[in-house]
């Protein structure tokens, strides 16, 4: 097997505690653009066609492993935090195959690495028959990073850590990203790393000297964008990483035919899919498994999570959709809320301050204002008046109601579930409907109006004079009576 034909295995180091995050959540599980940081590393490894991916866990191992369950990776636990060299060895020894693959080392807190960068790194490693290839970058000020020191011929000589560097070495701009491609000998050499240092830890960087002692080829592959190897060790760096990913994601969507009216304010998670000629107004947030079809407009400051929006849908500003399916040509909002289980068929109108949950509205249904529609199926072309409430909860259980097609529900009506309203029925405004309504019937369920002539004059005349003086309009009105 030639060097170029070797399979690729990946070890992802994700065992650190991340104390600078000051969080109960393991560092690598902090989300960036819709994925935990470690999931970005897994995604990149999969894009390379890796044969085997092992994630090394330690702090919060159960949480990390649960978060990645079903992703196709395997896990190895680092029992004690003994440094990167020990963590790598734990992961390498857990690989299914030994001694026949190149091994890529990634970190669970570097979510910005592009698969194309890693492909180029791997290609360089194999083209030069290298034993160890280090991914490096340059910064005007590389404070905090280990520096790459080269000999007079430009070959990598050693890596010096920040705390051990001389002033001259600290001036070096090229730094070690911590990402490596190693040949199949790496696990064997890693067993020879010692912890003879002030921290008493095993450092993966010591592999460089061990390879050099073997006379092996060691290279550095320098990338042009140092942002790619930006680690997120605290909340500030997490926000910086999120901003980089947001720009990447937004740019990709714009290049694919999506209009973002103010990209700096729009957040689209990596798991979202958008069609062509979609328009996103300022402040829009799209999350989870949201799928948006061609020609959809989403208004300013709307939040859409795990929802499907079919062709031509209009979501007006300040609307919140979660777990909803909105059919072609429907419009929602402004200030509407569609909760999980909502299905709007074609050309449905949901207006301002309407809330739905576990509701299916057939084609042409209109609910224009101030309504709650929960646990209900509503037939085609039904009109839901302002203030309509489906009273679906009895204090213990939710109950389902059915409203037929072509029904007219007057304003401020309450349907006390479970109810069945037949096709073409009328519900009078202000009714509290507590019995089923047959097809084509009119239901009126409200108290009879009483009108008491002269009541206001008697009421105010009996009021204390001090109260009447606070109402200047009242004296004039009483004089006219």
Swiss-Prot record:
Coiled coil: none
Main location: cytoplasm
Similarity remark: In the N-terminal section; belongs to the N-acetylglucosamine-1-phosphate uridyltransferase family. In the C-terminal section; belongs to the transferase hexapeptide repeat family.
Annotated region (Linker), positions in chain: 236-256
GO CC, alphabetical: cytoplasm; membrane
Function: Catalyzes the last two sequential reactions in the de novo biosynthetic pathway for UDP-N-acetylglucosamine (UDP-GlcNAc). The C-terminal domain catalyzes the transfer of acetyl group from acetyl coenzyme A to glucosamine-1-phosphate (GlcN-1-P) to produce N-acetylglucosamine-1-phosphate (GlcNAc-1-P), which is converted into UDP-GlcNAc by the transfer of uridine 5-monophosphate (from uridine 5-triphosphate), a reaction catalyzed by the N-terminal domain.
Sequence segments annotated as region (Pyrophosphorylase): 1-235
Alphabetical list of Pfam families matching this protein: NTP_transf_3 (PF12804)
The enzyme's E.C. designation: 2.7.7.23, 2.3.1.157
Residues reported in the UniProt entry to bind UDP-N-acetyl-alpha-D-glucosamine: 13-16, 27, 78, 83-84, 107-109, 146, 161, 176, 233, 339, 357, 372, 383
CDD domains: GT2_GlmU_N_bac, LbH_GlmU_C
GO molecular function terms noted in the UniProt entry: glucosamine-1-phosphate N-acetyltransferase activity; magnesium ion binding; UDP-N-acetylglucosamine diphosphorylase activity
Protein name: Bifunctional protein GlmU
Cofactor section: Mg(2+)
Gene3D superfamilies assigned to the protein according to its UniProt record, in alphabetical order: Hexapeptide repeat proteins (2.160.10.10), Spore Coat Polysaccharide Biosynthesis Protein SpsA, Chain A (3.90.550.10)
Residues engaged in binding Mg(2+): 109, 233
Region: N-acetyltransferase, residue numbers: 257-481
Pathway(s) where this gene product acts: Nucleotide-sugar biosynthesis; UDP-N-acetyl-alpha-D-glucosamine biosynthesis; N-acetyl-alpha-D-glucosamine 1-phosphate from alpha-D-glucosamine 6-phosphate (route II): step 2/2; Nucleotide-sugar biosynthesis; UDP-N-acetyl-alpha-D-glucosamine biosynthesis; UDP-N-acetyl-alpha-D-glucosamine from N-acetyl-alpha-D-glucosamine 1-phosphate: step 1/1; Bacterial outer membrane biogenesis; LPS lipid A biosynthesis
Residues annotated for acetyl-CoA binding in this entry: 386, 411, 429, 446
Alphabetical UniProt keywords: Acyltransferase, Cell shape, Cell wall biogenesis/degradation, Cytoplasm, Magnesium, Metal-binding, Multifunctional enzyme, Nucleotidyltransferase, Peptidoglycan synthesis, Repeat, Transferase
Compartmental location: Cytoplasm
Region forming the signal peptide: none
């Amino acid at each position: 097997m030639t060097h170029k034909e070797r399979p690729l295995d990946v070890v992802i180091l994700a065992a650190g505690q991340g104390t600078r995050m000051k969080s109960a959540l393991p560092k690598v599980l902090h989300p960036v653009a819709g994925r935990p940081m470690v999931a970005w590393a897994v995604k990149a490894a999969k894009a390379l066609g890796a044969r085997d991916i092992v994630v090394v866990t330690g702090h919060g191992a159960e949480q990390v492993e649960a978060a990645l369950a079903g992703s196709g990776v395997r896990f190895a636990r680092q029992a004690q935090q003994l440094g990167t060299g020990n963590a790598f060895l734990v992961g390498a020894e857990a690989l299914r195959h030994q001694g026949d693959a190149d091994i890529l080392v990634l970190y669970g807190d570097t979510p910005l690495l592009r698969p194309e960068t890693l492909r180029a790194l791997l290609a360089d490693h194999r083209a030069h028959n290298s034993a160890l290839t280090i991914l490096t970058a340059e910064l005007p000020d590389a404070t905090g990073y280990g520096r790459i020191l080269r000999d007079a011929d430009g070959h990598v000589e050693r890596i010096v850590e920040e705390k051990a560097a001389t002033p001259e070495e600290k001036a070096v701009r090229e730094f070690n990203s911590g990402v490596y491609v190693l040949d199949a000998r790496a696990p064997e050499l890693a067993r020879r790393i010692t912890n003879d240092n002030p921290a008493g830890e095993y450092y993966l960087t010591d592999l460089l000297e061990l390879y050099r002692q073997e006379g092996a080829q060691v290279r550095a592959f320098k990338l042009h964008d140092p942002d790619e190897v930006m680690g997120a060790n605290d909340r500030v760096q997490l926000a910086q990483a999120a901003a980089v990913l947001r720009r990447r994601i937004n740019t990709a969507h714009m290049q694919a035919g999506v209009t973002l009216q103010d990209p700096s304010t729009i957040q689209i998670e990596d798991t979202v899919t958008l069609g062509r000629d979609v328009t996103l107004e300022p402040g829009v947030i799209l999350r989870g498994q949201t799928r948006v079809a061609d020609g959809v407009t989403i208004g300013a400051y709307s939040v859409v999570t795990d929802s499907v929006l079919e062709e031509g849908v209009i979501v007006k500003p300040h609307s919140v959709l979660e777990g909803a399916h909105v059919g072609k040509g429907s419009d929602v909002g402004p200030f509407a809320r569609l909760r999980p289980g909502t299905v709007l068929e074609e050309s449905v109108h949901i207006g301002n301050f309407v809330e739905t949950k576990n509701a299916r509205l057939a084609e042409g249904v209109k609910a224009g204002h101030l309504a709650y529609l929960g646990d209900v199926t509503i037939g085609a072309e039904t009109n839901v008046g302002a203030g309509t409430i489906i009273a679906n909860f009895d204090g213990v259980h939710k109950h389902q109601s059915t409203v037929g097609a072509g029904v007219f529900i007057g304003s401020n009506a309450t349907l006390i579930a479970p109810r069945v309203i037949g096709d073409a029925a009328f519900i009078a405004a202000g009714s509290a409907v507590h019995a089923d309504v047959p097809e084509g019937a009119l239901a009126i369920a409200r108290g009879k109006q009483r009108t008491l002539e002269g009541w206001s004059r008697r009421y105010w005349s009996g009021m204390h004079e001090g109260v009447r003086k606070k109402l200047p309009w009242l004296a004039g009105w009483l004089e006219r009576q």
